[in-house]
């Protein structure tokens, strides 16, 4: 009776032949959940070969452990050590970008200075026009004051001026 229970338990935990042939994904999920001690201890080398007896069935998918390690090694080499030619090329590109940027900055500065010079000329012209107008208005004001002084003086001095003084 116990033998039947254990055999039915074993049969229920293992996938049927139809499940195995229909798709490899459920088979991989089951294999990933159960790892043997050998699979846990195995560490891939940087050369791309796995240490241990054989690669397991779960690595036979689209990206194997070797491909993964080679991809990470390739990325780390690309990031870490650049060849002298790459370094020189990168330096030359940086210098060229810097040269172009400096030239653009010089051109912007030149345009800004010419704009400022034009503005200075315009303001100087406006200032001279305003100074001329001020001078004209001051002369006109002084002339009007003089006329006002003469007209008020004539009225006072003419005949009504003595009466105005006598009444006080």
From Swiss-Prot:
Pfam families: bZIP_1. Keywords: Abscisic acid signaling pathway, Activator, DNA-binding, Nucleus, Phosphoprotein, Phytochrome signaling pathway, Transcription, Transcription regulation, Ubl conjugation. Disruption phenotype: Reduced sensitivity to abscisic acid (ABA) leading to impaired ABA-mediated reduction of seed germination. Abrogated induction of DHU1 in response to UV-B. The double mutant shw1 hy5 has altered root growth, hypocotyl length and hook angle similar to the single mutant shw1 in the darkness and far red light (FR), but shorter hypocotyl in WL, red light (RL) and blue light (BL). In addition, shw1 hy5 is recued for gravitropic root growth defect observed in hy5 single mutant. The double mutant dhu1-1 hy5-215 phenotype resemble that of the single mutant hy5-215. Residues 1-93, 149-168 are annotated as: Disordered. GO terms for biological process: abscisic acid-activated signaling pathway; gibberellic acid mediated signaling pathway; positive gravitropism; positive regulation of anthocyanin metabolic process; positive regulation of circadian rhythm; positive regulation of flavonoid biosynthetic process; positive regulation of transcription by RNA polymerase II; red or far-red light signaling pathway. Residues 90-110 are annotated as: Basic motif. Its main location: nucleus. SMART domains: BRLZ (SM00338). Residues 88-151 form the bZIP domain. Disulfide bonds: none annotated. Expressed in root, hypocotyl, cotyledon, leaf, stem and floral organs. Transcription factor that promotes photomorphogenesis in light. Acts downstream of the light receptor network and directly affects transcription of light-induced genes. Specifically involved in the blue light specific pathway, suggesting that it participates in transmission of cryptochromes (CRY1 and CRY2) signals to downstream responses. In darkness, its degradation prevents the activation of light-induced genes. Involved in responses to cold conditions probably by modulating the expression of several genes and triggering anthocyanin biosynthesis. This is Transcription factor HY5.
């Amino acid at each position: 009776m116990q033998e039947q229970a254990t055999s039915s338990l074993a049969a229920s935990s293992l996938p049927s032949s139809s499940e195995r042939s229909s798709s490899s994904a459920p088979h991989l999920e089951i294999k990933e959940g159960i790892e043997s001690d050998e699979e846990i201890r195995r560490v891939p080398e940087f050369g791309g070969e796995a240490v241990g007896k054989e690669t397991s069935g779960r690595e036979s998918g689209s990206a194997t452990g070797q491909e993964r390690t080679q991809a990470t090694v390739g990325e780390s080499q690309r990031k870490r050590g650049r060849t002298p030619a790459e370094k020189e090329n990168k330096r030359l590109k940086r210098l060229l970008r810097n040269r172009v940027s400096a030239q653009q900055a010089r051109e912007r500065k030149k345009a800004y200075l010419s704009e400022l010079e034009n503005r200075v000329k315009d303001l100087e012209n406006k200032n001279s026009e305003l100074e001329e107008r001020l001078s004209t208005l001051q002369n006109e004001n002084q002339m009007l004051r003089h006329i006002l002084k003469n007209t008020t003086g004539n009225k006072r001095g003419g005949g009504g001026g003595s009466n105005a003084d006598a009444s006080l």
